[in-house]
Amino acid sequence: MKIYLVGGAVRDALLGLPVKDKDWVVVGATPEEMLNAGYQQVGRDFPVFLHPKTREEYALARTERKAGLGYTGFTCYAAPDVTLEQDLLRRDLTINALAQDDEGHIIDAYGGKRDLQNRLLRHVSPAFSEDPLRVLRVARFAARYAHLSFRIADETLALMTAMTAAGELEHLTPERVWKETENALTTRNPQVFFQVLRDCGALKVLFPEIDALFGVPAPAKWHPEIDTGIHTLMTLSMAAMLSPEVDVRFATLCHDLGKGLTPKEFWPRHHGHGPAGVKLVEGICQRLRVPNDIRDLAKLVAEFHDLIHTFPILKPATIVKLFDNIDAWRKPQRVEQIALTSEADVRGRTGFEACDYSQGRLLREAWEIAKAVPTKDVVEAGFKGPEIREELTKRRVQAVADWKEKRCPQPKD
């Protein structure tokens, strides 16, 4: 029995990155030997065991053979005669097909170290094409390591494009698509994930609402980058700098979906694109089974982001109604989230990346003023039932009006 550290732990250590999870491969052992050594079996489809002390995963070396459609249609063979090289051959990328023995020696059967040095994401073998999920995984790795200047090998991108054209991605379940997307949204450069999907044709298959934005122009005065698809990826990049939250990043990604519905004769203007985009957000989220809290924020951002941009001239009643519409009284975090998505929208434009977004500050300040109005005073004043809500709203509007008169004085006619 020989045990090797494999995959991501070896890769990240060689890159000088923190190692989070460790996975191990066991060569020359049977399930019975593992159980007798105190390991706990957790895998049904193939033998995976938990170490009795560290609880890290130890998998018996195995080979896989395509036996059906999609990413689950594989027949697994695990036995003592399976070699380490055979096990590594089934992995997706060469940089993930590295192993390390107990003396620290690196086993590199497929050029993974060279590709790490060259910052290249390259598939191990033609068997890559048997698993459509790998298209999304490679896009995610491209996003994860974009700050290290990694790129996808031409032959790997060509294979991903061929897999997409062959309809392989249609076998992916919504849950797996969302899981990969969610993981990609947590990376430092999530926009790269969607750019790679577009490069191989997968964006049109998995996110047609986003793909439809490319080639749609916006007024050059406000959008020097002109193309709405490019703007969308720029805003996502900016959102990633402003917030680590998947909710904020996904909402930013979806904020302009309505522009894809504008008839060409109205280009480059997109009147009413916010409310129009809400249904598209609902469509994506229903299709991919996106969690409700993420969906709800994305819908609100699509509907109200343009309103936030005009915040200095909004009437106090409109501001309080906005807080009602986003349910800020019960979910106060939404104020900050919407401030950040709106800022990402403004700064996600060519030449505007470093601009100040005063509307966000005003939104936050107005919220502090409105929420400081005590409900207790209204109740103690004798208001009952629906009257409480009405009076509370009046007092909030007045408080915001008093603040706004000092903070945002408007020129007199």
Curated annotation (Swiss-Prot):
To which species is this protein native? Enterobacter sp. (strain 638)
Q: Which InterPro entries match?
A: CCA_bact, HD/PDEase_dom, HD_domain, NT_sf, PolA_pol_head_dom, PolyA_RNA-bd, tRNA_CCA-adding_enzyme
What family, per the record?
Belongs to the tRNA nucleotidyltransferase/poly(A) polymerase family. Bacterial CCA-adding enzyme type 1 subfamily.
Positions contributing to CTP binding: 8, 11, 91, 137, 140
Q: What is this protein called?
A: Multifunctional CCA protein
Additional information: A single active site specifically recognizes both ATP and CTP and is responsible for their addition.
Q: Which cofactors does this protein require?
A: Mg(2+); Ni(2+)
Q: How is the cofactor bound?
A: Magnesium is required for nucleotidyltransferase activity. Nickel for phosphatase activity.
Sites where the protein binds Mg(2+): 21, 23
Task: Provide the domain comment.
Answer: Comprises two domains: an N-terminal domain containing the nucleotidyltransferase activity and a C-terminal HD domain associated with both phosphodiesterase and phosphatase activities.
- The positions annotated for binding ATP are 8, 11, 91, 137, 140
Q: Which residues form a coiled coil?
A: none
Q: Which GO terms describe its biological process?
A: RNA repair; tRNA 3'-terminal CCA addition
Q: What is the stated purpose of this protein?
A: Catalyzes the addition and repair of the essential 3'-terminal CCA sequence in tRNAs without using a nucleic acid template. Adds these three nucleotides in the order of C, C, and A to the tRNA nucleotide-73, using CTP and ATP as substrates and producing inorganic pyrophosphate. tRNA 3'-terminal CCA addition is required both for tRNA processing and repair. Also involved in tRNA surveillance by mediating tandem CCA addition to generate a CCACCA at the 3' terminus of unstable tRNAs. While stable tRNAs receive only 3'-terminal CCA, unstable tRNAs are marked with CCACCA and rapidly degraded.
Asked if DNA-binding is a keyword of the record, the answer is: no
| Highest taxon, organism lineage | Bacteria
* MF terms in GO: ATP binding; CCA tRNA nucleotidyltransferase activity; cyclic-nucleotide phosphodiesterase activity; magnesium ion binding; phosphatase activity; tRNA binding
Which CDD domains does the record cross-reference, listed alphabetically?
HDc, NT_ClassII-CCAase
Domain HD, first and last residues per copy: 228-329
Under Enzyme Commission nomenclature, its number is 2.7.7.72, 3.1.3.-, 3.1.4.-
The subunit field of the Swiss-Prot or TrEMBL record says:
Monomer. Can also form homodimers and oligomers.
Q: Enumerate the UniProt keywords alphabetically.
A: ATP-binding, Hydrolase, Magnesium, Metal-binding, Multifunctional enzyme, Nickel, Nucleotide-binding, Nucleotidyltransferase, RNA repair, RNA-binding, Transferase, tRNA processing
Its UniProt entry gives the catalysed reaction(s) as: a tRNA precursor + 2 CTP + ATP = a tRNA with a 3' CCA end + 3 diphosphate; a tRNA with a 3' CCA end + 2 CTP + ATP = a tRNA with a 3' CCACCA end + 3 diphosphate
